[in-house]
């Protein structure tokens, strides 16, 4: 698989993000490297696994990571292949639901994560929520933000986003973040642009909107329905939900539907100033989640 790696200097001096990434290659990644953060004690009694979506990367969790680390936990934040500091396939068609899901399953096994709190937003949840049923002994909690089960049903808001994305093969990532979170500084916007020097690096950005299952037989839909059913019948872990209320695609209606699929999920934290990328308000979300779980 032909791929590009974003030059390391584009990630120099990232604001509020001092962590150096590790790189991992597994059988499921087809020779490509996943860049990831692995911080905190390796032998901690619990771990936070933070999964981002499109078109972001681990930088989106910069306000949540310090809160999780301060609790004494191990904290792991991978960049999906095609994003952040991970390798980037050149061809749009190299991306598939099963490819990314399989890479995450192998990654979790390789790092031997236990007592995991799964922290997800956007595609982090579309992939991530299908993982616990495959390895239930590893997962204890979920922290849900502006995401969904990818069961094959999509909203008109999503269809509008997909049409917008498909009309922009060289998507201006920084402009998208500025529109969603107007308080971002110029250097923060530049950090979201950093992984993508030009259109050659943006195959994942072009592919992902078209990977969202939009029919019952779409790739990923069946496993997502199975995951939804598993949560409904077998999940006994704790949960916390935060909603970026300004999200036009995965806002409160979508999140309330998700909440109904997670037994015991409490009333959500509503972040009225937050949009789709609600982790930009993540410090208070992480603190509230930990408080609801007794500070751990």
Give short role names for the model-derived ranges.
Residues 274-284:
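Catalytic histidine-centered segment of alpha/beta-hydrolase-like enzymes
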Residues 201-260, 270:
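Conserved serine/cysteine hydrolase catalytic core
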Residues 262-276:
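Catalytic histidine neighborhood in serine/cysteine hydrolases
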Residues 49-53, 121, 243:
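The conserved beta1-alpha1 loop
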Residues 37-85:
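Conserved HGGG/HGGXW glycine-rich cap/lid loop of the alpha/beta-hydrolase fold
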Residues 114-153:
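Conserved hydrolase catalytic core segment
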Residues 24, 29, 37, 70, ...:
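Active-site loop/oxyanion-hole signature of alpha/beta-hydrolase fold enzymes
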Residues 151-208:
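Helix-rich cap/lid subdomain of alpha/beta-hydrolase
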């Amino acid at each position: 698989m032909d791929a590009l790696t974003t030059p390391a200097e584009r990630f120099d001096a990232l604001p509020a993000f001092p962590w150096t990434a590790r790189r991992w290659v597994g059988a499921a990644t087809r020779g490509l490297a996943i860049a990831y953060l692995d911080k905190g004690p390796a032998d901690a009694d619990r771990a936070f696994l933070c999964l981002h979506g499109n078109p972001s990367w681990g930088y989106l969790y910069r306000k949540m990571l310090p809160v999780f680390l301060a609790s004494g936990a191990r904290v792991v934040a991978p960049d999906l292949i095609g994003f952040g500091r991970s390798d980037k396939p050149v061809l749009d068609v190299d991306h598939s639901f099963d490819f990314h899901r399989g890479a995450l399953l192998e990654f979790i096994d390789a790092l031997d994560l236990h007592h995991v709190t799964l922290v997800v937003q956007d595609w982090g949840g579309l992939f991530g929520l299908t993982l616990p049923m495959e390895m239930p002994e590893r997962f204890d909690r979920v922290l849900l933000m502006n995401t969904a089960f990818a069961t094959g049903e999509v909203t008109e808001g999503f269809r509008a986003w997909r049409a917008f994305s498909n009309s922009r093969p060289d998507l201006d990532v920084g402009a998208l973040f500025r529109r969603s979170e107007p308080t971002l500084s110029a250097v923060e916007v530049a950090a979201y642009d950093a992984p993508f020097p030009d259109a050659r690096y943006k195959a994942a950005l072009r592919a992902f909107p078209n990977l969202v299952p939009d029919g019952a037989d779409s790739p990923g839909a069946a496993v997502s329905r199975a995951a939804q059913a598993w949560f409904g019948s077998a999940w006994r872990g704790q949960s916390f939900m935060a909603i970026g209320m300004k999200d036009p695609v995965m806002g409160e209606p979508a999140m309330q539907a998700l909440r109904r699929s997670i037994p015991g999920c409490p009333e959500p934290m509503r972040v009225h100033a937050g949009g789709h990328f609600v982790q930009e308000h993540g410090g208070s979300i992480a603190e509230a989640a930990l408080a609801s779980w007794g500070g751990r």
